[in-house]
Amino acid sequence: MTEKLKGTTTVGIVCKDGVVLAADRRASLGNMVLSERVTKVFQIDDHLAIAGAGTVGDILSLVRLLRAEAKLYRAKVSREMSVKALATLTSNILHSGRGFAYMAWFLVGGYDSAPRLYSIDAAGGVTEDRFTAAGSGMEFAFSVLEENYRDGIPLEEGVKLALRAIKAATKRDVFTGGGVTLVTITEEGYREWSEEELKSLLE
């Protein structure tokens, strides 16, 4: 088989006190669903995270590289990399690999002096956003985000909005499904929400 595991919807939202990153858990090969338990949101450091939409192998490869670079940076300067620095590093890696491109789109979120969110395309183009989505179901997620997002949204409302956006994509996009991974990054650090916590918010 020449096709690769791919397909997903990722969402990022800047809230008053932090950033929300969320993604579905389905991995597909062509028209086949191969897994409903794939993780697509990853912690890079205490206040840094990344979500990937696209080819699973490429996402995991980049995550390993970014984690190593973040550890090296911390060892050299005795502090954590800024969110913008992580986004720039990700962009540089993607841009330098244009001849053998990563088949993925990334959302970088984190908290340094404030919550920040960046989207980075496969060629390395970077955009700072208040909210964004990527992947095969992004247009359905965007419709929910654009209608309901507001500046200064409280973190719990941002979590609920991210879940609604992923749910909208799940209903309409065959490559999105299998549950949700959702994390928040605040001044206190990185936190992955449990399935029970997310379910209670939707009740």
Curated annotation (Swiss-Prot):
Q: Which PANTHER family match?
A: ATP-DEPENDENT PROTEASE SUBUNIT HSLV (PTHR32194:SF0), METALLOPROTEASE TLDD (PTHR32194)
Positions of the pro-segment in this chain: 1-7
Q: What is its main location?
A: cytoplasm
The name this protein carries in UniProt is: Proteasome subunit beta 1
Q: Which domain of life is it from?
A: Archaea
Its source organism is Thermococcus kodakarensis (strain ATCC BAA-918 / JCM 12380 / KOD1)
**Catalysed reactions, semicolon-separated:** Cleavage of peptide bonds with very broad specificity
Q: Which family does it belong to?
A: Belongs to the peptidase T1B family.
Membrane as a keyword of this entry, yes or no, is no
Q: What is the lineage of its organism?
A: Archaea, Methanobacteriati, Methanobacteriota, Thermococci, Thermococcales
Keyword terms: Autocatalytic cleavage, Cytoplasm, Hydrolase, Protease, Proteasome, Threonine protease, Zymogen
Q: From the UniProt record, which GO molecular function terms apply?
A: endopeptidase activity; threonine-type endopeptidase activity
Q: How does it assemble?
A: The 20S proteasome core is composed of 14 alpha and 14 beta subunits that assemble into four stacked heptameric rings, resulting in a barrel-shaped structure. The two inner rings, each composed of seven catalytic beta subunits, are sandwiched by two outer rings, each composed of seven alpha subunits. The catalytic chamber with the active sites is on the inside of the barrel. Has a gated structure, the ends of the cylinder being occluded by the N-termini of the alpha-subunits. Is capped at one or both ends by the proteasome regulatory ATPase, PAN.
Means of activity regulation: The formation of the proteasomal ATPase PAN-20S proteasome complex, via the docking of the C-termini of PAN into the intersubunit pockets in the alpha-rings, triggers opening of the gate for substrate entry. Interconversion between the open-gate and close-gate conformations leads to a dynamic regulation of the 20S proteasome proteolysis activity.
Q: What does this protein do?
A: Component of the proteasome core, a large protease complex with broad specificity involved in protein degradation.
Q: Active site annotated at which positions?
A: 8
Is Cytoplasm tagged as a keyword? yes
EC numbers, comma separated: 3.4.25.1
Q: By its UniProt entry, which InterPro entries does this protein fall under? A: Ntn_hydrolases_N (IPR029055), Pept_T1A_Psome_bsu_arc (IPR019983), Pept_T1A_subB (IPR000243), Proteasome_bsu_CS (IPR016050), Proteasome_sua/b (IPR001353), Proteasome_suB-type (IPR023333)
Q: Which GO terms describe its cellular component?
A: cytosol; proteasome core complex, beta-subunit complex
GO process annotations (BP):
proteasome-mediated ubiquitin-dependent protein catabolic process
Subcellular localization(s) per the UniProt record = Cytoplasm
